[in-house]
Amino acid sequence: MDGHFIIEQGARSWNGLYMNFNGTAGIWSKEAIVDAGGWHFDTLTEDLDLSYRVQLRNWKTKFLFDVVTPSELPVDMNAYKSQQHRWAKGSIQTAKKLLPLVFRRNDSFIRKLEACIHLNQYMVHPMMIIL
């Protein structure tokens, strides 16, 4: 899991793309959280939701390669499936909630496109079945 986050989050940070803080590994400014409207509980991925809202309010984010934080991984396949279901549902909830705001911003086409792909990444699975 560490390798995945190093590559994904590092690339997002390095390229100025929207990135998400993982619930167990974000260091937040209280002012940024308040400015973005605080924690919302209308999505299953409140950390993803807050990450995007903070950036939509022009707060800067950065991935720190040299900071190590422990995290818990699912202990069995059922726990993994449950985690992935929450992440999939929450990502799509966040996409429905925030992509209209992303599209209205004065961001580059690439940044908007990548945000769309990032928030809708779990849609690949049903699309594979359909196609």
Predicted segments with their positions:
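Long helical/loop segments within the catalytic core of UDP-sugar-dependent glycosyltransferases
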Residues: 1-44, 77-116, 120
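Membrane-embedded multi-pass helical conduit in multi-pass membrane proteins
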Residues: 121-131
